[in-house]
């Protein structure tokens, strides 16, 4: 896989999962499919712009991101409620690692 594609994926993910995620999306996506869907809609925007030529992959990433965040946001909320910061941050980093594994392995089938 070319380094340019790797960098594009990293940047798109950073923008979509970080910069475009509002506080309300972050705190409400574990409780509301509306806010989870709004987050995924915002998340996927940079991917649509950069990877417009493989929209099938972009759609697959939106679906997989929704499923993963549906699960992990609930786990993260539980750690926050019991004030277990170590497990919360371990869960966040694990979530991000899973996102990248999915992104990098799946794109190889589309390029």
Task: Report the location of each language-model feature.
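Functional transmembrane alpha-helices
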Residues: 58-67
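Interhelical loop and helix-boundary elements at the membrane-water interface
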Residues: 9-43, 66-108
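Amphipathic alpha-helical interaction segments
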Residues: 48, 52, 56-57, 70-74, ...
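Transmembrane helix interruption/hinge and helix-loop junction motifs
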Residues: 1-4, 49-58, 111
């Amino acid at each position: 896989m070319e380094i340019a594609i790797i960098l594009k994926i990293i940047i798109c993910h950073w923008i979509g999962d970080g910069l475009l995620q509002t506080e309300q999306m972050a705190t409400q996506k574990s409780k509301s499919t509306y806010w989870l869907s709004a987050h995924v809609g915002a998340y996927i925007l940079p991917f649509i712009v950069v990877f417009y030529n493989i929209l099938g992959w972009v759609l697959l990433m939106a679906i997989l991101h929704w499923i993963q965040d549906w699960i992990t946001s609930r786990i993260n909320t539980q750690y926050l409620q019991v004030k277990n910061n170590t497990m919360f941050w371990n869960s966040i980093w694990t979530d991000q690692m899973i996102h990248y594994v999915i992104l990098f392995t799946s794109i190889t089938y589309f390029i």
